[in-house]
Amino acid sequence: MARTTSQLYDAVPIQSSVVLCSCPSPSMVRSQTEPSSSPGIPSGVSRQGSTMDGTTAEARPSTNPLQQHPAQLPPQPRKKRPEDFKFGKILGEGSFSTVVLARELATSREYAIKILEKRHIIKENKVPYVTRERDVMSRLDHPFFVKLYFTFQDDEKLYFGLSYAKNGELLKYIRKIGSFDETCTRFYTAEIVSALEYLHGKGIIHRDLKPENILLNEDMHIQITDFGTAKVLSPDSKQARANSFVGTAQYVSPELLTEKSACKSSDLWALGCIIYQLVAGLPPFRAGNEYLIFQKIIKLEYDFPEKFFPKARDLVEKLLVLDATKRLGCEEMEGYGPLKAHPFFESITWENLHQQTPPKLTAYLPAMSEDDEDCYGNYDNLLSQFGCMQVSSSSSSHSLSAVDASLPQRSGSNIEQYIHDLDTNSFELDLQFSEDEKRLLLEKQAGGNPWHQFVENNLILKMGPVDKRKGLFARRRQLLLTEGPHLYYVDPVNKVLKGEIPWSQELRPEAKNFKTFFVHTPNRTYYLMDPSGNAHKWCRKIQEVWRQQYQSSPDAAVQ
């Protein structure tokens, strides 16, 4: 039988001791001394208790003298309504909720408003999830957590007014720059440790800590979110049973897999996974499916790549311990004092982390072989250069602001004159061919080039093997620059198309040294190494194709 709107309010009650105010003031809770009403009370009957709006329902007449003189009571704030806000872009979408940026018309304050469909919540049995998230967030008052300012509702939806973390998910930056340098890794790990110390001190286990659930505010400090699977421990309990799987495969603790229980130490396991990912660019436990990931977790089967920071490695090894009572930071190991005293945090001042200026996000790109050079890239600088196609010059970079020299005009229809073979598996084309010559080149490619099958019948303009890096890991790929334009990369051993670097007007190549070059895109920087030492030729050809695609003439100035 379908529930009424009022029954849904009762199905998602605020705890009897705390009711959320419906205004974004510094203090977000107020006392509620009367017990909540029974779910069985019909919607038309007056009752005293708390509602999803964060206000109390009208009580029946009382002999209490304060209630006989309403003028002596403080005025109740008006309930917020959807029309009080101007809703903007979607910030995120979940299985039963959507988070939208909204500006309150009366104050011009921005919030991330989480909108939940009542019907869908009931149908999918997600009422406990919603209740848990709201109740946990109402207990938190710390700068490293997303803040719940207010709740309200209409006939069809629930609305949670949350603090707006303008810089989005931490995962976005890991994907963008690959690996954090040691300074960035240390600072953001320290903020997560500080947040967990507070959370566990409140008797709360997050149970789904991962980079997607760690947001960054306008000042680039962390704000942890998503408490739908969190657990509030009773005073005499140290762990929580899980009747079903909670968490995300790559970060789930072994005790949840083997004992179906989670404890505060389970969050410390996730912390170890996150530190590893900040440095290496990928989580420690990776496989083709969740079952294989779980097998690796319960066997503690993972490896550190070369050039992993030694002190960070020692910290990860002390967190990724199968016995939950042996993890650094857990109660059995004397709590957070020894964790914060680890040598990796030697330079951290813990008292005022949220007031410190976060370090600039800087990529860590150690040399992969003895004859390579280390590369460091400042993420803010990369962002500021997206509007400019010109490749920056530096002491270790080749200036590629223009094509080196105009190629001579060709005559006749001998298409071989356009092809420059670099070795048996690499070549590039001059781009001065006619449409008829292009057709002949494409026929030649289709008939004899083994990589033609991967390029959707586009003419290959340059190709060759590269080492494609993701964090501290590198994979050999065949890079194929084609008309379109497209940049495909193929697994040369298994002959499988692995992906494509997305083209846009913001795409920008950058040579760092003879072997290493970057391809910057708005959402990610691709780190590539040409083993033949011709990184500058890749950048020159990519830029030449960019000019043909986005500029009216090849000689137009770079904007």
From Swiss-Prot:
PIF-pocket: region residues: 116-160
Record-annotated active site: D208
Keyword Magnesium part of the UniProt annotation: no
Chain spans, region Disordered: 25-83
Annotated catalysed reactions: L-seryl-[protein] + ATP = O-phospho-L-seryl-[protein] + ADP + H(+); L-threonyl-[protein] + ATP = O-phospho-L-threonyl-[protein] + ADP + H(+)
EC number: 2.7.11.1
Organism name: Rattus norvegicus (Rat)
Gene this protein is translated from: Pdpk1
In-chain residues carrying the UniProt-annotated modification Phosphothreonine: T357, T516
Protein's recorded name: 3-phosphoinositide-dependent protein kinase 1
Subunit: Homodimer in its autoinhibited state. Active as monomer. Interacts with NPRL2, PPARG, PAK1, PTK2B, GRB14, PKN1 (via C-terminus), STRAP and IKKB. The Tyr-9 phosphorylated form interacts with SRC, RASA1 and CRK (via their SH2 domains). Interacts with SGK3 in a phosphorylation-dependent manner. The tyrosine-phosphorylated form interacts with PTPN6. The Ser-244 phosphorylated form interacts with YWHAH and YWHAQ. Binds INSR in response to insulin. Interacts (via PH domain) with SMAD3, SMAD4 and SMAD7.
Modified residues (Phosphotyrosine): Y9, Y376, Y379
PTM annotation (Phosphoserine): residues: S25, S244, S396, S397, S399, S401, S413, S504, S532
Gene Ontology annotations of biological process type: calcium-mediated signaling; cell migration; cellular response to brain-derived neurotrophic factor stimulus; cellular response to epidermal growth factor stimulus; cellular response to insulin stimulus; epidermal growth factor receptor signaling pathway; extrinsic apoptotic signaling pathway; focal adhesion assembly
Compositionally biased region (Low complexity): 35-46
A Gene Ontology term for the protein's cellular component: focal adhesion
